[in-house]
Amino acid sequence: MITVQSLSKKYGGFTAVDDVTFTARPGRVTGFLGPNGAGKSTTMRIMVGLTPATSGSAEVSGRRFADLPNPGLEVGVLLDASAQHAGRTGREILTVAQRMMGLPARRVDEMLDLVSLSPDEAGRRVRNYSLGMRQRLGIATALLGDPGVLILDEPANGLDPAGIRWMRDLLRDYADGGATVLLSSHLLHEIEVIADDLVVIGQGRIVAQGTKAELLEAAGTLVRTPRVHDLAGALTVSGLAFTPSTAAGSTDALRVEADPALVGQVAQQAGIALIELRAAEGAGLEEMFLELTADTQREGAAA
């Protein structure tokens, strides 16, 4: 289990992480989402002891990362696949980690097989690896000690579609075996497919968290009309709360906190023709993400 409590990080007058609290539970994949610069990577670095917190705490299985006697046996970490030693071979990197953890030598070959790095690829220096190969090596290193917790920042970067599916299945199986998986990714569809729980961060603060089903169900109704301003007025008169929807860059859509039947009734009574009317949960994670983080987005940034 990962427990983050009232976590904050300040750099001078800039607050990168602001009173963040959430829990990632065993047997579940937790998707950690937010726009670029939202504080995801800083939070993860604090979790694994690479960045000191200004206040608050981040614990793995009830202890700080720095207090774990042999961290690799309890927490598998992949924050930056490009940070591996470029002058070593893939096998050498895994062998160093295997010896530091006190594991049998056979674990190196087991992990190379698991991530589909061939003997030839394992013998190459990392400087000659593609980003996808570095990601596979990083995942192998994270899984080497068979830890009960995984903390992965953008592990799908550089993987082709087949590689992304492989990673998704691997992490799903790992969580189903009882492990805690915390996963950050800008590939919202992949998070939607694999995640059980979601934590959404914007400008260093948590803007939403809960199970994926809960958050998507709370999306309400998506409605589109050329007369969006007239519909907004009718909804206001009816006492229904709504917000502009940013789905697919739309400017004629609203998300209404009511069921589709009621929204359709209001539109009909006002004589307003609708282009689209459906439960917003059908819009999926991208719709929810864009709406929750609308005030924290940089132009063109997805996560």
Where do the PLM segments sit?
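Alpha-helix N-cap/helix-start and coil->helix boundary motif
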Residues: 8, 65, 91, 188, ...
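Structural motif corresponding to alpha-helix initiation and N-cap regions
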Residues: 41, 105, 123, 134, ...
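Conserved beta-strand edge residues that scaffold enzyme active sites
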Residues: 126, 188, 249, 281-282
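ABC transporter nucleotide-binding domain
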Residues: 167-257
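C-terminal coupling/interaction segments
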Residues: 255-303
